[in-house]
């Protein structure tokens, strides 16, 4: 949803600026953990309850994560700001945008690889190596299996899609034959 992304962006950018002064990986872990907690309907219910104070919500969120960064004043201020502005539900989007900023800084990108068959370690390593050469950046792959592809893979890196699946080739042939 574009609106959520627009609202979440300043929070992600502000948190990233704070993280640049310390350990970006640790902050990334914290924001990912907070996003997981914020996805729980029970947490959102408690956070929106008039019977629970904002301070209690902040303490609940910080207690629910394992990251050592959560003990710091910056983390508490960040969560307090989200609670005060009723933005807890934005944490998953904030985490996503924080990861994008982190990847951009590292010259990396997330790669979603969908394969018709499970990829073993050597095959995946070879595929990722070739994709890194093609996209000219370090890739962080996530792999899914979708047998409807029939064969081949579909790779999504940012807004670029590389589809070498048999299903895509058949669709291309069908379009060419019916045109």
UniProtKB/Swiss-Prot annotation:
Question: Which protein are we looking at?
Answer: ATP synthase subunit delta
Asked if the keyword Transport belongs to this entry, the reply reads yes
> What is the annotated localization of this protein?
Cell inner membrane
* Name of the gene this protein is made from: atpH
The record, for NCBIfam families, names: ATP_synt_delta, PRK05758.2-2
- Recorded source organism is Burkholderia ambifaria (strain MC40-6)
- UniProt xrefs under Gene3D superfamilies: N-terminal domain of the delta subunit of the F1F0-ATP synthase
- Entry-linked InterPro entries: ATP_synth_OSCP/delta_N_sf, ATPase_OSCP/dsu
Q: How does it assemble?
A: F-type ATPases have 2 components, F(1) - the catalytic core - and F(0) - the membrane proton channel. F(1) has five subunits: alpha(3), beta(3), gamma(1), delta(1), epsilon(1). F(0) has three main subunits: a(1), b(2) and c(10-14). The alpha and beta chains form an alternating ring which encloses part of the gamma chain. F(1) is attached to F(0) by a central stalk formed by the gamma and epsilon chains, while a peripheral stalk is formed by the delta and b chains.
The molecular function terms in GO held by this entry are: proton-transporting ATP synthase activity, rotational mechanism
């Amino acid at each position: 949803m574009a609106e959520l992304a627009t609202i979440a962006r300043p929070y992600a950018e502000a948190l990233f600026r704070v993280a640049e002064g310390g350990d970006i990986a640790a902050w990334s872990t914290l924001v990912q953990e907070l996003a997981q907690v914020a996805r729980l309907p029970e947490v959102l219910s408690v956070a929106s309850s008039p019977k629970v104070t904002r301070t209690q919500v902040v303490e609940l969120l910080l207690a629910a994560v394992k990251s050592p960064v959560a003990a710091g004043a910056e983390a508490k201020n960040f969560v307090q700001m989200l609670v005060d502005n009723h933005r807890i539900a934005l944490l998953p989007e904030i985490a996503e945008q924080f990861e994008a900023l982190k990847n951009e800084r590292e010259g990396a990108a997330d790669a979603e690889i969908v394969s018709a068959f499970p990829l073993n370690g050597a095959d995946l390593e070879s595929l990722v190596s070739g994709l890194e050469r093609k996209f000219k950046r370090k890739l962080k792959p996530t792999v899914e299996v979708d047998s409807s592809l029939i064969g081949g893979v579909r790779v999504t890196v940012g807004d670029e899609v590389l589809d070498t699946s048999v299903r895509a080739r058949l669709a291309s042939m069908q379009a060419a034959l019916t045109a």
